[in-house]
């Protein structure tokens, strides 16, 4: 291992793992991709890794545990598999960055709370909808208390694989919980829509935020703009369609000002198509989390 690099591995050679591989090669930062491990020796992801000269294995997590120099593991398998992986990785002193819905560790959104969990052995990236919308709800709640937040995420049917389709309930529950726990909303709701349009649409999100009362509109607008800029540092295709709109509406809590934000996420096109911004924001967030963890490890070694 290079002195200024931390060895990392990707567990899972499907679309998510493969896109993450390309991101780590394009922007390695303080990370050295030492292994891509899967369980299907004929998978396209492992074949692509071999073509790029990256060590591969079809032995799954056992191959990762066999290399004591691997410090960080990106788990892009399934929630069921990660339950087992989380235990084994913890026992072997490895850091797990979980891209599945398993949530065996704390929820993490890079520009919001990553710095609070740098000593955690396992962190979870929630959902694509959570990574997209939690930063904006948090941008409001850090200025004024938020009574209620609601997000509607519309993604292309082509970007929603069998895992997404089988876990719709988990998606809505986990995303809503993230809007509350990290976003700062007292109560939240999440909705996902799969759009079969062709050509495929980009990921689009509508976020409604209901503050507790009157608030400083300029301060909120500035906070949202800063948060968008923060996310764009690792997801360049993350953008608001227009400035947040503030309308007075009748709500279950009486007439209140409601903040409405329209967000679009375009992927980088590393491996997944650009319309799959919902998947790209997960792999982009994972790369960013890995980068910060690696920096933290190197600082501890140097201390």
From Swiss-Prot:
Family matches, as InterPro entries: Acetaldehyde_dehydrogenase, Acetylaldehyde_DH_C, NAD(P)-bd_dom_sf, Semialdehyde_DH_NAD-bd
Catalytic residues in the record: 128 (acyl-thioester intermediate)
GO terms, molecular function: acetaldehyde dehydrogenase (acetylating) activity; NAD binding
GO term, biological process aspect, one: catabolic process
Domain of life: Bacteria
Annotated signal sequence range: none
Alphabetical UniProt keywords: Aromatic hydrocarbons catabolism, NAD, Oxidoreductase
EC number: 1.2.1.10
List of residues binding NAD(+): 13-16, 159-167, 278
A Pfam family it matches: AcetDehyd-dimer
Keyword Oxidoreductase appears in the UniProt entry: yes
Cited HAMAP family: Ac_ald_DH_ac
Descriptive protein name: Acetaldehyde dehydrogenase
Species of the source: Chloroflexus aggregans (strain MD-66 / DSM 9485)
Lineage: Bacteria, Bacillati, Chloroflexota, Chloroflexia, Chloroflexales
């Amino acid at each position: 291992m290079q002195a200024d690099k931390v060895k990392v591995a990707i567990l899972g050679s499907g679309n998510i793992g493969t896109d993450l591989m390309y991101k780590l090669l394009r922007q390695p930062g303080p990370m050295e991709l030492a292994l891509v491990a899967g369980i299907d020796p004929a998978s396209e992801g492992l074949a692509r890794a071999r073509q790029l000269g990256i060590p591969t294995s079809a032995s799954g997590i056992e191959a990762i545990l066999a290399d004591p120099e691997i410090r960080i593991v990106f788990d892009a398998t399934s929630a069921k598999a990660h339950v087992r992986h989380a235990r084994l990785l913890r026992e072997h002193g490895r850091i797990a960055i979980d891209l599945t819905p398993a949530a065996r560790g704390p929820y993490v959104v890079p520009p919001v709370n990553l710095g609070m969990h740098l000593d955690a052995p396992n962190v979870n990236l929630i959902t694509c909808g959570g990574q997209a919308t939690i930063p904006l709800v948090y941008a409001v709640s850090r200025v004024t208390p938020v009574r209620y937040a609601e997000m509607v995420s519309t993604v292309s049917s082509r970007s929603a694989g069998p895992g997404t389709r089988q876990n719709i309930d988990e998606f809505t529950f986990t995303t809503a919980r993230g809007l509350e726990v990290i976003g700062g909303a007292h109560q939240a709701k999440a909705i996902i829509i799969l759009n079969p349009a062709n050509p495929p649409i980009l990921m689009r999100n509508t976020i409604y935020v209901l503050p507790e009362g009157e608030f400083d509109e300029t301060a909120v607008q500035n906070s949202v703009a800063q948060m968008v800029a923060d996310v764009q540092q690792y997801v360049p295709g993350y953008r608001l369609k227009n400035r947040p709109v503030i309308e007075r509406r009748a709500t279950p809590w009486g007439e209140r000002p409601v903040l409405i934000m329209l967000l679009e996420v375009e992927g980088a096109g590393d491996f997944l198509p650009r319309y799959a911004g919902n998947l790209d924001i997960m792999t982009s967030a994972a790369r960013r989390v890995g980068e910060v963890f690696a920096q933290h490890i190197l600082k501890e070694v140097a201390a």
